[in-house]
């Protein structure tokens, strides 16, 4: 339970909160919308809401395709502002109509578009922060020489640069990071601090003549500095013509093997829904009408989106994708979805997460394995081994989300009112962590 909740009106208020917390040895928990699922925005210190007063767009450079915002701006509202300029902020979570940029940076959020537009860390250019001593510091891309100059500063900022250098300059540290951190091909990763980003710099054995500490703040969940302004790189909006192929499969494993084929096709979306999620929508008045694309009773459906600047081009892309799946004997039905119907399918996919909470009875799909990611080529084997583990415990799970990125959200169906299922909760999560590793 938090000790207190604060709603700072300006940067001076944040500095006062930091001074008070430091003096009294209390933690601060920066918080925006609180839509994350793993407890990142709760704690026993002072919860600091920036969602009320830090909601402004500070600057916008249309030519450079960059924008600077305060952390409390909502992701979809930002994109509504950018729409007339045919630009947008790419990372797209299922909570995009309420999640905020500060939280997305803290979590290194990604969402359904990451296979095309990357994750939040990729879009962060600089972050204006308040440090633990109350000083105001901007972290941005700087040259290796500028990094060394920062190390000479007799300030808290200088001590940060010195600490980074002293930790990473040794070959042994660099080798340990390379050994223990995820493969570079695993793009979706928000576990721990992204110190492996620094190994790209020529300071630490890489080839880049620059380094950016803001990349470390992305995914740090507000533990390193208090963000007050964030500069983002924007993307041009998706080509105007798109087709969504809804590929139906008789098993989860078949759909994941098919993903290896689909990802050769320059997709904009590659998302998985399993039978359990689809079944949750049957009796929902709002979503039942969005089930129009389903044929028979698939165990899994992949949502595969292609896009181009003309309908002729996009039809060729869609037909090539379907032909490739059929040639490799994957799936039993591949329906092409057009126009406004595409958003209806995505609405069903987004609603699925919330509808899981309406499962009848005490058994619920428990959010405890949210962002395990593996290399795409390892995904079928990983899920096969996870399913075998669940079978050994005589348990079922929900499988959904970001197949094309090698990240499936897995939700064991447990009754946490029963002691034995609470024990299983711990066993399943621990064994899954080892399995991913």
Give residue spans per PLM region.
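N-terminal glycine-rich flavin-associated loop
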Residues: 1-28, 46, 50-95, 105, ...
């Amino acid at each position: 339970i938090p000790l207190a909740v604060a709603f700072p009106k300006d940067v001076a208020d944040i500095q006062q909160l930091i001074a008070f917390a430091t003096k009294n040895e209390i933690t601060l928990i920066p918080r925006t919308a609180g839509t994350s699922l793993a407890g990142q925005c709760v704690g026993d210190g002072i919860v600091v809401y920036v969602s009320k007063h830090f909601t402004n767009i500070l600057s916008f450079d249309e030519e450079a395709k960059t924008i600077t915002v305060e952390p409390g701006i909502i992701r979809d509202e930002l994109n509504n502002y950018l729409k007339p300029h045919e630009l947008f902020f790419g990372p797209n979570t299922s909570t995009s109509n309420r999640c905020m940029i500060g939280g997305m940076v803290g979590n290194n959020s990604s969402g359904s578009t990451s296979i095309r537009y990357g994750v939040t860390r990729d879009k962060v250019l600089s972050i204006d922060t308040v440090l633990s001593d109350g000083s105001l510091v901007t972290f941005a891309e700087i040259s290796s020489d500028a990094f060394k100059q920062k190390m000479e500063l007799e300030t808290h900022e200088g001590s940060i640069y010195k600490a980074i250098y002293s930790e990473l300059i040794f070959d042994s540290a660099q080798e340990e990071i390379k050994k223990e951190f995820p493969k570079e091909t695993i793009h979706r990763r928000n576990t721990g601090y992204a110190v492996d980003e620094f190994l790209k710099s020529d300071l630490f054995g890489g080839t880049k003549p620059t380094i950016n500490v803001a990349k470390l703040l992305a995914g740090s969940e507000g533990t390193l500095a208090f963000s007050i302004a964030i500069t983002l790189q924007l993307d041009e909006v998706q080509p105007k013509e798109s087709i969504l192929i809804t590929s139906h499969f008789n098993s989860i494993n078949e759909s994941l093997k098919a993903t290896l084929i689909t990802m050769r096709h320059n997709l904009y979306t590659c998302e998985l829904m399993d039978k359990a999620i689809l079944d949750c929508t049957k009796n929902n008045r709002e979503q039942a009408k969005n089930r129009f694309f389903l044929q028979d009773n698939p165990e899994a459906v992949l949502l595969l989106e292609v896009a181009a600047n003309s309908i002729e081009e996009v039809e060729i892309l869609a037909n090539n994708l379907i032909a490739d799946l059929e040639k490799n004997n994957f799936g039993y039905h591949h329906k092409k979805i057009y126009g406004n119907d595409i958003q209806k399918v995505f609405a069903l996919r987004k609603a699925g997460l919330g509808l899981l909470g309406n499962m009848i009875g005490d058994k619920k799909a428990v959010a405890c394995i949210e962002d395990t990611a593996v290399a795409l080529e390892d995904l079928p084997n990983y899920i096969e081994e996870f399913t075998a583990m669940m079978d050994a415990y005589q348990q079922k799970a929900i499988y959904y989300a970001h197949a094309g990125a090698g990240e499936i959200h897995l939700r064991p169906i447990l009754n946490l009112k029963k002691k034995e299922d609470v024990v299983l909760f711990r066993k399943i999560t621990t064994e899954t962590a080892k399995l991913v590793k």
